[in-house]
Curated annotation (Swiss-Prot):
Subunit structure: Homohexamer.
GO biological process: regulation of DNA-templated transcription; regulation of RNA stability; regulation of translation, ncRNA-mediated
Protein name: RNA-binding protein Hfq
Origin species: Rhodopseudomonas palustris (strain TIE-1)
Domain Sm: 11-71
Function statement: RNA chaperone that binds small regulatory RNA (sRNAs) and mRNAs to facilitate mRNA translational regulation in response to envelope stress, environmental stress and changes in metabolite concentrations. Also binds with high specificity to tRNAs.
UniProt cross-references to Pfam families, sorted A to Z: Hfq
Entry keyword set: RNA-binding, Stress response
Gene name of the record: hfq
Family of this protein: Belongs to the Hfq family.
Membrane-spanning intervals of the chain: none
Amino acid sequence: MAADRAQNLQDTFLNHVRKTKTPLTIFLVNGVKLQGIVTWFDNFCLLLRRDGHSQLVYKHAISTIMPGAPIQLFESGEDSPA
C-alpha cells in the first residue's frame, strides 16, 4: 500500500536537513539549547555535530527544532495533508 511506503514528516524533515547540512537550533524539554547539524538519526535519537564534536540526542527530550535557514520540503503545488 502507498501509505505504508510514505515517509512521515519528521523523517522527511530530518533527512532533508541532514542531506543539506542545514544548521539547526534544538531546544530540549528542560530548556537547554543545542546547535549543530544532523549527521544521523533513527526512530529514537539523532546525532548532532558542532565544532568537531558529536552529541547523541534522544528525540523524547526534544521540544522544538528550528532550522537556521528557510527550507522547502514539498513542491509548492502539492496540497498540504491538513
